[in-house]
């Protein structure tokens, strides 16, 4: 008895020493007295509440306490409402209590017995506490009961919200719940269940979720009041919700009514289980007392009190009615049943403090005593211990479940905080409470959940994991939930020790499978004490856990398959704990052993799958690393190869296959670096590879690599087996081949993959070659190149890859650039139309070269296939148009063969100093675009058009951008050459040159843009005769305009110059400078001057006064004039009419021939003779051009090889010039004012701004016409070239004559003043015919007269 807790000792002594009848009667009467006292105590509160209640009609009850009137009315009203509700509840409970007492006492109780029952008290410890309860007068118990029963109606803050009562701390230690108990206390279950006190649902806001038979096993009435207990917390609002009876703590010596008396501490102590303070103390005290309580105490107690006493006491229920005795029997029987079941469940929890055999013996003795007690009692209405003990494998088979369910759901539906069920360990904890308290708070009890705390004595150093994670999620003292279908589950001490040993290692295992477990896991006992550690699975905060549990149970249909997977798991992951059965699941997991084993096997399988995912992630990382280092390098350094690293994670076969295909198809630009470190001599390696040693293994390995994994089908066992097999194979294979790989040998599988790549070499190489011009849209070419050239050095492959990337980027941006170029051109402010015409007209070389250079450029620029067709149509149009335009021209027929004597320039050699007669002429030939309205203009184009044909043949792929750049460079060079005039001298010597040198980019852009508009120009050009004029720079630096075919745009530029100027501009400039300096030194009247645009116009005007008014020919087309003026905007010569150009050729080209050396070009001398003859003829009178003169010129052109033919040519040219100049002056008189107002610029002054007045369309038409004429005149180039050398000697005489003519005209021999045929020299005298007009150049006059 020394180890028996104080309450139990008190109860045992009181129950054994007191008479059987007196305690019952006394307790019943005391209870009645307390109920009445509680009622009277509530009367003042009722009157106060009715006073505050407006609907109350009673005026007598409106008298409220004076002290309470000072409180705010709103506060008093709220308080009154709450107190009224509580008072009504108390009254209802009191009435129910009285009715229950009356039914229990029946006729055995009268008023005379009331006073007698309040006197006697048992001696001993109980007697010491008697003054607190039974020894007091009838009035005192009423007063003392007030704090016990009245709080229901008291204004205490705890009553403010009934649902918060569960969270309030208990008034005092739970040991006080049994302090006033005596032997005279009646058993609690003596009250009938037929008359329960309806507990207000407000106090218990959480209804039960699931009916539990155990919850229905002991449903005591809530309104039941014990004997007067001042310190008891029996019926206080914070404890009345936890009324329960102890299960498994009743000593065998106690009779049924004494067992119920012993349950009073449970009734009083459970009230604060929701309270954190009371629950904490109760938790700690339970741990202390549970360790001290053992079976020896029970055995000693049984030895001192034989069962006969119990039987006698059981048969002494004479005061109870039959219903009361039935209730007592039912409750005692269920208590014993629950004790037996609890002992079975807790047998593993008491292993350290008491052996299961000793505890089972005590329970067995208790069952036997109860059975004997039942046999001796008369009524056995509901229970038979012998039968029920055999039929109770678990709490689900309790006797008469209908009665318990009915009583529970009807009267106590909200008894236990709304939790699913009342767990027995909560009652056990309250029954084992001692007066010792702990400072460390324990979590509240949980019901119908697994327990993670063993009912052993705890220290203040309890693991805080229980209390820090989730206070409401941890379990109470250990007991198994009632969900097991096999009650034979008993965790062995070995399993518990294993659970304790592997608890820490189970956390990482459970982390992927059960993420909710870690949050709710608590270590109940420190590991240093070798206590059982378990996991908690709270249902209250994780309601999905039952569903998960059912799902896990349902997925265990294949235990054999899971067993195999477990075996595989033990092989593939040997680092896991071998004894991980209890580490995966807690020892208290509510399943049978068989189901537990299957569940753990399933969890292991799930973990294996999860680790497989982690392995895949690791393999993907290895693959990423594989791209940065080759297999040979990683193996040579002693590191595990990427395949080995991928095999180690369990997915080797699949990832190795990926690696293999990645090596074959990986578009990574660094693939060349990976392959660059492999052996270079593949043939030698393949021959020297030891196939006999590695052949079988490698082939098997390759088959395994190509074999699809069956893990996708869900066969985990096969997947694991295959993975292990492949891993072993690969490890052996890689270990065997490691040295060979380092020596430069290649495994069979790698060799085969390389062979496949080598077989694809021709295709890949072809693709790369064809994509050089096609500009691939993706990087496949780079990849194929790297694979094909994998044997190259890494640096070489990098350079090649960089080149291919640049090439690919260049072609990718080709089309956008082609679109941006025209946009930039049109956005330029008043872009030069002449540059457009110059660049627009495709050179004869471009037209003739066909698909040679143009197709190549088209592919480079990604032109559509129609580009070639467009070029073909353009070439055909060019072939046919000149014939229709020039067929009716007698002059053209006459001068078709005239250029035979003109020497041709070197077609393929670099720039060389041309003959003296041609030195100053060729730079101006790109300025030869012109549209004229007369076919007669072609008569002066014979020589130059023939020479254009020769140049076209010599330069088949010459492009206009080169011409433009060359012209710009020449202009910059001409500034240093005093006698040299740049291509822009058609209007002024300075302004056109500046335009070219400042914006050569525009010219290049315009050329490329015009090429895009060539088809649109074809139709417009076919209906217009096209004759161009060229500025001929004579040896002394003077410039003249010579009409010629528009094809001379490119043809008149020397091939050598075109080839050398883009790269050797300075060389050409120096040569030109030397030539011009030599020519100027040989001229007598020559003086170096700066070119002036106004000088040429003034110097030329005196020569044409008679012609200015002589003739009125047809009005030129406005479009033609605009195109002529358009030419002034670029370095090239503006389009002019044939008369004006011819006149300039006559008047300007003859001037510098005075002191030409014999080496001067015969063509230049011939031109000088022509102009000399014309001007000599003009002195007398300008003669109109007649048909006879044209025929004469035509006949003389046939014998052009002689000087007489040259003289005839000069005569014809002079007649043509006279006619055109007269037309120019006649039209100019009536239109000059209109021109001035329209353009707001001088017609002939510097700078001439006509170049800003025209549009690009005219230039495109002009360019197309020029290209057409070039194509036609191609055939005439070769014979003219042959005749050039033969005609050089006869032309020398003409040169001499020109020199003599120049002596007669000293005023026009100044080279600097006659530089520009557009702007006359300023020192020229003005004629009377031009006095009324602006100073202008004859060419501009011709251009403006038709507007």
UniProtKB/Swiss-Prot annotation:
Keyword terms, alphabetized: Differentiation, Membrane, Spermatogenesis, Transmembrane, Transmembrane helix
Where are stretches of biased composition, namely Basic and acidic residues?
1108-1127, 1137-1146
InterPro entries for this protein = SPATA31 (IPR039509), SPATA31F3-like (IPR027970)
User: Ranges of Pro residues compositional bias?
Assistant: 198-211
Q: Which Pfam families match?
A: DUF4599, FAM75
User: Which cellular component appears as one GO term in the record?
Assistant: membrane
Where does it localize? Membrane
Function of the molecule = May play a role in spermatogenesis.
Family statement:
Belongs to the SPATA31 family.
Name used for this protein in its record: Spermatogenesis-associated protein 31A5
Its source organism is: Homo sapiens
